[in-house]
Amino acid sequence: MTDQNEARLVKRAKQGDMHAFEELIIQHEKIVYNVALRMMNHSEDAKDISQEVFLKAYRNIGNFDERSQFSTWIYRITANTC
């Protein structure tokens, strides 16, 4: 995904567009799961963490600073959740 496309999706998600947020999830679900798996070393825990991460992201998307990369933000949420 290009940075420009990601920025458009984030902007739409911040405005309440669920389809845009769903696309962000699809684009980042593998990396979130893999980071959680590396940190937790257990696949079921990594799945649970992934769900929690995207729930936190959804609840806090309004606070996301669009000058930052969404991928960096979601990675940080993942690391903090683990």
How should each PLM-predicted stretch be described?
Residues 26, 47, 58:
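Conserved catalytic core of two-component sensor histidine kinases
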Residues 2, 14-23, 33-52:
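Short, charged helix-capping/linker segments at alpha-helix termini
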Residues 14-15, 41, 54-69:
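Sigma70-family region 2
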Residues 34, 48-55, 68-80:
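Structural recognition of an alpha-helix C-terminal capping motif at a helix-to-coil junction
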Residues 4-7:
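Acidic, Ser/Thr- and Pro/Gly-rich low-complexity regulatory segments
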Residues 24-28, 32, 78:
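Hydrophobic/aromatic residues within well-ordered alpha-helical segments
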